[in-house]
Structures are given as structure tokens and as C-alpha cells.
Amino acid sequence: MTETKEEKVHKVFEKISPSYDRMNSVISFKLHVKWRKETMKLMRVQKGTNVLDVCCGTADWSIMMAEEIGPEGHVTGLDFSENMLKVGREKVKEADLHNVELIHGNAMELPFPDNSFDYVTIGFGLRNVPDYMQVLREMYRVLKPGGQLACIDTSQPNIPGWKQVFNAYFRYVMPVFGKFFAKSYKEYSWLQESTREFPGMSKLAEMFQDAGFSYVRYISHSGGASATHFGFKKKE
């Protein structure tokens, strides 16, 4: 029987969870931290707000958001990999944060009522879901009117030369790093496939609009290696 994308992704992240944080730093040369900080600055997050971090993984962005909104706010992190959540819960505990809850769930069917959150974030997770549009629509649904979505993910560089280098790096070098640092050549080979198949910046912006978002914009990071897309749910 052929594995579905959802089953394959779940198996990948259950296996790589112990080395995920270290590999993120190796693969991106720690640039993922810079990209997230740049995104946070542009979001202008307000204190005391309610946040959902979809595909939260090991909770890096959940923790950053919790520190930003302060003790009066609340962050819910959701992921479908219990092993990733286990790592995340340890990090939340070490950070001594009491305004973060990490739950097991499916981004395709968010277990929350409509209009629940002031902010929704998803970092390096959208490319791994079975249906991009379904997840975008779900995130739109749970946002409050006036709420903001921020999505960071890999992208497709357009700069001649850099595009070829980027593609070669993800296709040939990243799986080798995965084998050397995490003993997971097969898993990191698959992750480069998800990167290659993910829509480019302008196409993803169109998908945001199709899902209902307004005032959609995006910024590229590191020559288009990554991008952040922003969208708002219009006030009623």
C-alpha cells in the first residue's frame, strides 16, 4: 500500500525529533533564528493576546511568541508529532513559561471554534501538510476579525546562479548532513522534496488571497531561500 503524504511526514518527524533543533541550525546555518526575528519585528505583536502556533514542532516560535505577549497572553502550540511535542514541552519547562500549552492535533482540522486567536503562526510547516489550501482556510477560520497570520517557509530563489546553488544544496548536501548529524539520510532526502514542490512566493500569496486573507504581503530572506507571508482577516 502506498504511503500518504501525511503518513510519510508523521513518520519523518517522529524519527528526527531528537536531532531536529540541531539539524535546523546546521541546515540553515542558524539563519532560521534571524528569519523568525525579522518576522516578529514586522508582526508588531501586542501584549496580552491569544496566539496559535500551527505545526509548532519543538516550540521555538511558540516560546518566542510567549515571551513577546507576556504573562497576560496565551500561546497554544499544535503539532501532530508527539515526539516533537515532547521535546517542545521540555524547552517550555526550561524557559519557565506558564502561558504556553502544547497540544497534539491536526492542522487540517484545527480543534478550535471560529474567531479564537489574535495571531496564528506557522513556521516551516505548511510545505509538509497534505493540502496547503485546507490548512490556510482552517487558519483563516480560527483567526479573530482583524487577526494576523504569519507563515515562514522555504521558498524558490529567483536570482540566477543562486537558484541553482540553492537547489543543489537541498538536493545533494542536506541529505548528507542528515546522515552525518542525525543518522537520517532518507528522512532529509524526503524533506528536500517537500521544499522543491512548495509554491514560490507570488503563488503562495495568491493562495493566501484565495483562502480569504486580506492585505497579503511577503518578504524574502537570504535571497529567496526562505520567505515570510503575512495576511489579515478583515474586521467585520
UniProtKB/Swiss-Prot annotation:
Enzyme class (EC, first level): transferase
UniProt: S-adenosyl-L-methionine binding residues: T58, D79, N106, A107
Catalytic reaction equation(s): a 2-demethylmenaquinol + S-adenosyl-L-methionine = a menaquinol + S-adenosyl-L-homocysteine + H(+)
Entry-linked InterPro entries: MenG_heptapren, SAM-dependent_MTases_sf, UbiE/COQ5_MeTrFase, UbiE/COQ5_MeTrFase_CS
Top-rank lineage group of the source organism: Bacteria
Family that this chain belongs to: Belongs to the class I-like SAM-binding methyltransferase superfamily. MenG/UbiE family.
Name this protein carries in UniProt: Demethylmenaquinone methyltransferase
